[in-house]
């Protein structure tokens, strides 16, 4: 207690004197930081620590028994613990079944004995004694059999170590095995998803060629064996590197760390195959081992210092010979035709001995066992092999093997691991280059340009002759080699110390040297990065002087010499976001820099963004500058992460010690989704989020943070306001919109494109903006369409800002607020069980019903009929054929059960719809009201649009222009322009296959964005009414009229977004993903940005924050090193922007005109 009190006093004094400055906090020793955080978590436990008791039902499929069970687990249990719980339940259930069977069999035996007693009345005494003894014997046998059956059941299921949990593939990922050390909260598992409990053991088929067979069977060294396929039992949940190590140990091969697995490509005939990613499992790479044949090959050449002479052991000599022979035949070491003839002649001498004229063995040899695949069909090559074979008469087998190995080592390709690549782009790295056009995400490269009256920026790509054709990219422990596969001529050769960095994006591998940069396309991009990182890591371990210099550079730049003892050794190749990496300030990203200086543009970053471009820094590089080391190493250090947490916790400490100001109470009227209205007295100085949680706790809701408040908008007041706005127009044109939102065509005034947003839950207030230039006008609705908005205003309103006090949001005393569920995460909470939280469940049911009836949650005809029949069961009970018959419903009654305009959309008559509802209603006989509501909610959960909130948008047309901007596309030669009064966001050309440029200009500033273009947005129609929705995991695009799904993108692909009030534009930036940037026109741009910020902040607080501040992480028994590594390395490395505050996760930047 004395230490804690001392730490408390020190921390309070630090906060008072340093004014909570990060630079001052960096001077705190790491040991004191650890004690401070442990103390603060102990004294001030965050609210989310109570979430550790949250349990979640999971459906488990027992593959062995082919049945599905449902079990409830804590979301903070590890997968290993969950597997043990499932295994124990299975064993216990089978024990109970076995005991019941034994009990029934013993009862049957007693009944048979009793019947014998009745038949033999003359011998009662003897029969009774025998009966009792028999019964005792049966009981004894039952006890023995029960113990043996329990052990037999465990033997039948096998060891628990052989089982795991398997998750099938989803929308944006492959199938995977759940890792044992991860928690259930780490994985996003929906309530309707089923996990498979099955054995991890599977069958792996490895194809071995002749040389490898001779290594396995050394007795058959005199003859060549045909290629065979061997089957091994392996653990499917292990990575490829672990599998290859186990296989090498089973085969008793030397140097198992040099081996890896390949997959034979069906499209190629050269036998080269494709290297698998070593750090992933087979299911994560989309490979089914039951239907795939693998190759076990040598991938690394770490051990090259073997002395090749006659003193070698015979087994070692044969092993090295087989490795060289295998590499020559499968073209892992490319060679010329002359060299291949010499190799084949030496191989004949080893296999057949001295040359004998007219030997049948030589005439019947298969050329593919002696020659690479590319030389088999050459003319007269067999005659040339025989000529060289005759010259080797008298050479022993050992001498021939030595010559074969020496000849293989003399090749310039020996020791290299080669990959087949396509060179897409080669550029010269020049210090005077201003900005270079980026390459598109597709197969082409793009040059983007944008110009304006003040500034101009252009992008150029300096391409060389060696691009857009096949090449061989080789990596060794010393250098990187690029060859022409036809002639084996050297294209480029660089040592590893001349490599500055490289990054991987999908199947694109880009490597940057000191004087040039190459971009390749390859199916083995991840394997190339892995081999290069492994060689650098190996060299770094072998040369500790380089590691020491690397650490000194880090310490000299960071200036934290006091943290040397508590810091672990840095990894050789660190992974980070490409945006934060700058080797030189003159080569900064001009696109992002100029985007920030547009007048009136608000930019926000998405903290959930996962960078697809994996950027690696080479510590062996001799050109490391101080700025690079500072940018790279200070980004993800453990101390920086600790300081971020410390800053957040210090603010919580300040709030706890500060005196609260006197409350200003006021009464608010709150309406709920079940149509009930209640009054609450709240403190208007508190934020909306705090008030919402207070209301939720008063109602008895366990998860009040998922709810928020909306301001109910009155239709009549809005119409009056809009009419008054129209009467008092300004000198320039203004843009305004009311709740119904008739959207006139952008840059297309001749065409009357009109759509309604009557199904939009959150209608926006009229947003008037005046500008000096001509702007697009969104007209008010006519009286004809005013009826279509009655449902929208009754269902929802305007979301209040959650982190602002209630007094600052201009809420009139007579206004009504709507208490609604706003956030839908991965089904964690009490909604899965209608009995655990009835208030929460009841509100969720009514909100889901309103969303279905208002067509917010779009569904098919079959789904809508099931939902309508369930509502029938809730309202009218079981089906009664005397009452529920044609004529019971009227056509106007369908609006209470089905979405609007359902008859026109499906092309059915009222009688057919009514008959279908009655037919489905009959199947629900006997279901009580509460379970019918639960069924209704579960049906809604299965919809793709469940939990989504939609907004009316249009994608901008990239053909017409009003501003002065230009862009060019290099793929198809097409040019396209688009501008919005010179102030907005100007999109670039479409480009052919992922290429194309895009420009952004505003107020005389133009920039170049390279080849982002509109790669993925081509699936979205341009200048047509669309619906943009944000669901639990995805960003949805739908057509406004037919509600047809167009495309969906995961939230983790959204890098950032920006909106412009004057031009009413919203830009979704997907970073390096194929979608690029999507520019939308909407009157609700600010509302969309606010909602998206709140949603991402909630996800960060709920999921990421709960793991960052868990008591299991801040364990006082752990050491300092494990404390730093466990608490901050899990979730922060995959996000672009990491913030730990519970109030503002996203970063907002508002800049003025430069």
UniProtKB/Swiss-Prot annotation:
Alphabetical list of Pfam families matching this protein: FERM_f0 (PF16511), FERM_M (PF00373), IRS (PF02174)
Composition skew (Low complexity), residue ranges: 448-463
UniProt feature, compositional bias: Gly residues: 437-447
Keywords assigned by UniProt, alphabetized: Repeat
Induction: By starvation.
Alphabetized SUPFAM superfamilies for the sequence: PH domain-like (SSF50729), Second domain of FERM (SSF47031), Ubiquitin-like (SSF54236)
Any one cellular-component term (Gene Ontology): cytoplasm
Superkingdom of origin: Eukaryota
Gene Ontology biological process terms from the UniProt entry: actin cytoskeleton organization; cell motility; cell-cell adhesion; negative regulation of cell-cell adhesion; negative regulation of cell-substrate adhesion; positive phototaxis; response to cadmium ion; sorocarp morphogenesis
Domain FERM, chain residue ranges per copy: 218-547, 666-1103
Location of the region described as Disordered in the Swiss-Prot/TrEMBL record: 122-149, 432-468, 715-734, 771-794, 961-980
InterPro entries: Band_41_domain, FERM/acyl-CoA-bd_prot_sf, FERM_2, FERM_central, FERM_CS, FERM_domain, FERM_f0, IRS_PTB
Changes seen on gene knockout: Loss of FrmA leads to increased cell-cell adhesion and results in impaired multi-cellular development, slug migration and fruiting bodies. Mutants show increased adhesion because of an increased number, persistence and mislocalization of paxillin rich cell-substrate adhesions, which is associated with decreased motility. FrmA null cells are unable to efficiently sort to the apex of mounds and form the organising center known as the tip. They also show a delayed expression of LagC.
Keyword Repeat appears in the UniProt entry: yes
Known role: Key regulator of adhesion dynamics, it acts as an anti-adhesive. Plays a critical role in the regulation of cell-cell adhesion, multi-cellular development and, in particular, the formation of the organising center known as the tip. Required for turnover of paxillin-adhesion sites during cell migration. Plays a major role in normal cell shape, cell-substrate adhesion and actin cytoskeleton organization.
Protein's name in the database: FERM domain-containing protein A
